[in-house]
Curated annotation (Swiss-Prot):
Keywords: Cell projection, Cilium, Leucine-rich repeat, Phosphoprotein, Repeat. SUPFAM superfamilies: Outer arm dynein light chain 1. This is Dynein axonemal assembly factor 1. Residues 256-294 form the LRRCT domain. It comes from the Eukaryota. It comes from Bos taurus (Bovine). Residues 1-85, 332-405, 537-643 are annotated as: Disordered. It holds the Pfam family LRR_9. Residues 54-68 have a biased composition (Polar residues). Its main location: other. GO terms for biological process: axoneme assembly; cilium assembly. Coiled coil: none annotated.
Length: 643
């Protein structure tokens, strides 16, 4: 009757069927249950209605929605797996080996680092048969398992896990160190199957009674035991520890039993015979001896034992020092013997053997043995030194090659032996010649005396013999100076000087009074003339030629008329007379100052009395003598300052 109304009914049924399929939105079902207005809107909207031709598209949409739902469920499951922890898979282990630069082939690796990875169980290690060290620290492992293939394992680290029991360690016959600290273990068990177990660390667990550690009696090879920070409180645990024959290191810190045992350290040291390290410090032999003395006789015996050991230690130090002293003494003796052999002498130290015999007679047998050991040690030390460092003959040095002079003063350096210049050598030679002549007391006369003088004048020349350029004290009288310094030299030189020397002395006095830089430089300058250089290099022959060239009459006059120095300076005689002797020490006077020509060469001055310059020099000396007479004793004489 009403076909138009029937069509929407069919459409509405189709919509309900679509709404019942999974993956379709719930809003579509809600719209199906809505009023007629809502249904009319759905019929008028071609996008949301499912008409006959569009049934295939509706089914495809349902299928796509189902696939997306299944993918989301799988992803959720994978996330749950990741939350539960990582698995020790073969792929993961291979990747880890590559990351740590280990071998890709599992059997070639001897160490595997699996700590801090969050594993909850041990698995997939069958291929790693060559492991010697396995790190499983800081994981969530709840059980020791799946270690049957690790027969070569030496070290197993399982600290900071969730273990409650020690088990499944039978395949590890070569295990040496086991660390299961920071777990929840309440009893030590299943360790007797490890025949070579040396180190067991069980700190921070839940051990409480003697029965919990009773299994340690069966661990005969256990050497290091760490039971710190447990709940052990019974002193009877010492019986268990005493039964462990190889126990060397024990740590019981953090247990109540420490407070329950009086004299805890002494008692454990005495009862555990092989203990070398207790808790946080070693057990020294001295501590063990004192503890055993305390066990025998109390605190007094311990004090006595401690004093005896201190005395022995002190004696040991003293013996060491004596051995070193013996080494040094024997080294000095060998050096002294070597020096004696070089000099051709073979003396023996007086009384050395007697002293040694007396000492050996007074010593006790024990001290004698100690002394013999020291001597043996010294002997072996020197033999080793001779083997390693053979002694070589010392080459004579430059100072030893130089001739030793009788008159050479001590402390003179080699640089001071040579004179500064040829003039200095000339000036230094005169006093030595005078000294030799005055010591002999006779004047050289003839060839024999000349040869004797040559032999006596072989002395070294020093810069120290030059006069010191210092000011002379003005308050000192000239007479005292003459008597103290120059009078003996004037009498000795008077026999060697001729009549022309007083004029020469006047010139030198004038030159020394007018001391200037030019004069001093001319004195110490080396002339360029080769003939003068040859003469200065051989001063001995020139000086010794002075005596035979003089006339006997001039020698007699010079020796008969010596005048005192004060009388000469005070005289106002005429310049025409013979000039007086100056206060110059003739032995130390240098040759007459040289004149400098236009080319700058130094030429020797002509002899006084042989040229026209004699009158000019005498006229210049006369006013100087007058000034000296007016000044009196307060005048400062530079000549004596140079002496």
């Amino acid at each position: 009757m009403h076909p138009e109304a029937s069509e929407p009914v069919v459409d509405g049924v189709a919509e309900q069927e679509c709404a019942q399929e999974p993956g379709v939105e719930e809003s579509a079902g809600d719209h199906g249950n809505a009023g007629e207005g809502g249904r009319k809107e759905e019929m008028n909207d071609p996008k949301e209605t499912c008409v006959g031709p569009l049934n295939t598209s509706c089914l495809s949409e349902q299928k796509q929605s189902g696939d997306s739902w299944s993918d989301g469920r799988l992803a959720h499951q994978r996330a749950d797996k990741e939350d539960r922890g990582a698995r020790m898979t073969k792929k993961f282990l291979q990747k880890l080996c590559k990351q740590h630069k280990l071998y890709i082939t599992p059997a070639l690796n001897d160490t595997l680092y699996l700590h801090y990875k969050g594993f909850d169980r041990i698995e997939n290690l069958e291929e790693y048969t060559g492991l010697r060290c396995l790190w499983l620290e800081c994981n969530g492992i709840q059980k020791i398992e799946n270690l049957e293939a690790q027969t070569e394992l030496r070290c197993l680290f399982l600290q900071v896990n969730l273990l409650h029991k020690i088990e499944n360690l039978e395949p590890l016959q070569k295990l040496d160190a086991l660390n299961i600290s920071n777990n929840y273990i309440k009893t030590i068990e299943n360790l007797s199957c490890l025949p070579v177990l040396n180190t067991l660390q069980m700190a921070h667990n839940h051990l409480e009674t003697v029965e919990d550690i009773q299994h340690l009696r069966e661990c005969a090879r256990l050497c290091v035991l760490d039971l710190s920070h447990n709940k052990l409180s019974d002193p009877e645990i010492l019986r268990v520890l005493e039964s462990m024959p190889d126990l060397r290191v024990l740590n019981l810190m953090g247990n109540p039993v420490i407070k329950n045992i009086p004299n805890y350290r002494r008692i454990l040291t005495v009862r555990l015979k092989h203990l070398t390290y207790l808790d946080d410090r070693p057990v020294f032999p001295k501590d063990r001896a004192c503890a055993e003395a305390w066990a025998r006789g109390g605190y007094a015996a311990e004090k006595e034992e401690r004093q005896q050991r201190e005395m022995r230690e002190r004696k040991k130090i003293t013996d060491s020092i004596e051995a070193l002293a013996a080494l040094r003494r024997q080294a000095e003796e060998r050096k002294w013997q070597r020096a004696s052999q070089e000099q051709g002498e073979e003396p023996t130290p007086a009384g050395a053997g007697d002293v040694d015999a007396e000492v050996e007679g007074e010593e006790e047998p024990q001290e004698k043995d100690t002394r013999q050991k020291i001597e043996q040690f010294v002997k072996e030390s020197f033999e080793a030194k001779d083997e390693l460092f053979p002694e070589k003959p010392e080459e004579p040095s430059l100072l030893e090659e130089l001739p030793l002079d009788v008159g050479e003063p001590k402390g003179v350096l080699p640089s001071e032996v040579l004179p500064a210049s040829p003039r200095a050598a000339w000036a230094e030679l005169a006093p030595q010649t005078v000294a030799t002549e005055s010591a002999s007391g006779t004047e050289p006369d003839g060839a024999e005396n000349l040869e004797a003088t040559r032999l006596e004048t072989k002395e070294q020349l020093f810069i120290d013999d030059l006069p010191n350029l210092e000011d002379v004290n003005a308050g000192e009288s000239l007479g005292d100076r003459d008597r103290e310094q120059c009078f003996p030299k004037i009498t000795a030189i008077s026999s060697l000087s001729d009549a022309s020397e007083p004029d020469m002395d006047d010139i030198s006095l004038l030159a020394l009074e007018n001391t200037s830089s030019d004069t001093l430089s001319s004195i110490f300058a080396v002339p360029k003339d080769t003939s003068w250089r040859v003469e200065t290099e051989t001063p001995f022959t020139d000086i010794l030629k002075v005596a035979p060239e003089r006339d006997p009459e001039t020698q007699r006059k010079a020796s008969e008329v010596p005048r005192p120095l004060i009388q000469e300076l005070g005289d106002d005689e005429e310049p025409s007379g013979p000039p007086p002797l100056p206060p110059v020490c003739e032995g130390e006077a240098v040759p007459a100052p040289c004149t400098e020509d236009s080319d700058g060469d130094l030429l020797p001055a002509p002899a006084p009395g042989n040229g026209p310059e004699k009158d000019e020099v005498q006229s210049e000396v006369e006013p100087e003598e007058r000034l000296g007479s007016e000044a009196g004793e307060n005048r400062e004489d530079i000549e004596f300052g140079l002496d």
